[in-house]
Amino acid sequence: IYESIYRQGFMISLYTNATLVTPEIMELLRKYPPHKIGISIYGASPETYHKVCGNAAAFEKMLEGSRLLCTLPSVTEFRTTIIKDNLCDSRKIEKLVKENFGERHSVTQTRMVMKAVRGACADVESCRLSPQDNVKLSLQKSIDILRERIGDGFDENNVRIRQENLKKNADCGSAVNHRLSLFGCSGGMTAFAVTWEGKLQACQTLGAFSTDAVELGLKKAWETFPLSVKLPEPNKKCLNCEMSDLCQSCYALRYAETGNLQDCPEYACRDCEVMKSFCL
């Protein structure tokens, strides 16, 4: 599959935890290097990997695999998802990446952990951070920079964010305001995902609407996908919410968190409330 889509001219982004990078896989990747590689790291020690993944040995395998992948001419980036079990490593992961793979690399953190839409062996609500810790984590890098520059007089309790009125700006004739969209993003417009059973949908998370790429063929499944989309009336609470500019909720997140496209996801709402407390 990989070789075929590469030969068709697709720009491939390869996402991996880097623990199963074998000589055979490297031989293929050297012949057909992906345009971009995203490596997921779940801790900065074997102990944390054991807590998060149940396999302490995966830590060294990740480092070894990452070193091999970094020899490719691909653009390489590192990412992580922080939950309760690896919160203690949130800064250490960034340090690990810079020490092993160079100062130019940083680590992208998942902004919000949503519930699983497919089978999962863990209860997301018991694993993910509280909204308070999640927001603080998202501001951590900025707070660390301020602390370094200000010095001993810095008090993170006094940090406030200036909030721009995005709605007001969008009403001033912005071209973005008039862009055609199905879900308010690129999903179903310039991007799609195909599931393991051949269902074409807007993204990996939003499975409420789909066409059958196996039965129809990829071209027709893509062309007819918009016809499968029938969105409900917008939630009035969300339409009138004063925190909408801060909201991380999209149709996919709503679907994952509530099981439908209309209800308010409580976790995202609480996240907004905490973020609002940091705003001027």
Residues covered by each model-derived region:
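Conserved Radical SAM active-site core
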Residues: I1-Y15, T19-Y32
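A short helix-loop-beta-strand connector motif used in the catalytic cores of GNAT acetyltransferases and
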Residues: G188-M189, P232
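Alpha-helix termination/capping residues and helix-transition junctions
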Residues: K31, E99-N100, N235, S244
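Structural motif
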Residues: Y15-N17, T81, E273
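Flexible mid-to-C-terminal extensions adjoining Fe-S/redox cofactors in radical SAM and related proteins
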Residues: A175, R179-L182, K199-L200, Q204-L280
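Structural motif corresponding to alpha-helix initiation and N-cap regions
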Residues: T22-P23, P46, L231, N235
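Radical SAM enzyme [4Fe-4S]-AdoMet core and its adjacent flexible, acidic
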Residues: H35-K36, S40-G187, A193-E197, T205
